[in-house]
Amino acid sequence: SLRYMHQRYTAKPDKVKGILTDISTEELSHVEMISAILYQLTDGLTPEQIKEAGFDAYFVDHTLGLYPQSAAGVPFTAAYFQSKGDPITDLTEDMAAEQKARSTYDNILRLCDDPDVRDPIKFLRQREIVHFQRFGEALRQVQDDLNSKNFYCCNPSFDSSCGKTACRRKMR
């Protein structure tokens, strides 16, 4: 969510900015859904259940408070996402992020048989596919506004002359 929200400020055209805004807003609801699932799974655990589940190291640091970290226990950091200010770079990375999220949901579904977890995860997985497609549309929009023979000749968010004819001049 934060990645897309920050990228929207330099995104052009406005349609791409709108896509980034819409998806960043929806991704916040994904965080809420995952947090609700985690809370429901951990609420009321006994010390014995915590130890049995291998959850004791987490419990020592956070009790049952939700703390953003990977499945391996690596804490979340803003270094996980990027905003380069180049829409081709950013949208390509966004598409990869959506595919990684989908793969993570696939792995959760392989390991989980609880329908109260599986059903919302299936929903989130489908939304990641839609986001991937929307970012693909946004990337095509950016590329359509550029010189079709060389998308990489300039940065459309920075170079004011970046357009269909911009790459006829040599880059310095």
In which residue ranges do the predicted regions lie?
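Non-heme di-metal
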Residues: S1-R172
